[in-house]
């Protein structure tokens, strides 16, 4: 921040090795980062024939249908993490909370309080809706700034009109 550089962090979710504790600790660590920063959340991709593929299958952490390719086309829809993708509710909970950490207008104290709720971990719908709303606000701020600078194009407007492409950083 002292040098005027905005940090960008890339995180990988949908990792079969990460535990609930790992996800909680990641959330808590990122919650200590000073604003401004952007988070880019990606879904782990296991490619057929890769070393990762072999090790995860050998250790029983994934099955052949978890490998991206012919039987699994998740990578087409889930390269960047999307809250509507079907995954375990606890994972969606942590992803939604983590997405909101990069939004300085969302109080961290609220997010930290929500992170401790066993009810919300099992029923993350309110957290997902809050994350979606925060993403819309950030997208509006970004689009407004681009429009003011004359950078907004019809192509960008069309691209952003899809819920699948909402800005989640």
Residue ranges of model-derived segments:
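Conserved C-terminal portion of the radical SAM core fold
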Residues: 1-51, 97-116
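Radical SAM enzyme core and accessory elements
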Residues: 51-56, 67-169
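Short secondary-structure boundary/capping segments
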Residues: 25-26, 54-60
């Amino acid at each position: 921040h002292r040098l005027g550089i905005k940090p960008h962090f890339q995180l990988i979710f949908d990792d079969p090795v990460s535990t609930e504790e790992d996800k909680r600790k990641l959330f808590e660590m990122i919650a200590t980062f000073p604003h401004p920063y952007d988070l880019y959340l990606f879904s782990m991709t296991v490619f057929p024939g890769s070393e990762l593929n072999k090790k995860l299958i050998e250790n029983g952490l994934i099955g052949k249908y978890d490998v991206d390719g012919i039987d699994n086309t998740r990578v087409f829809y889930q390269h960047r993490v999307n809250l509507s993708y079907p995954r375990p509710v606890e994972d969606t909970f942590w992803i939604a909370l983590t997405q909101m950490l990069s939004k300085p207008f969302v109080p961290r104290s609220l997010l930290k309080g929500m992170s401790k709720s066993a009810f919300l971990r099992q029923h993350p719908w309110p957290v997902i809706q809050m994350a979606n709303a925060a993403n819309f606000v950030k997208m509006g701020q970004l689009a407004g700034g681009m429009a003011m600078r004359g950078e907004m194009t019809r192509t960008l407007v069309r691209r952003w009109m899809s819920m699948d492409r909402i800005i989640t950083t």
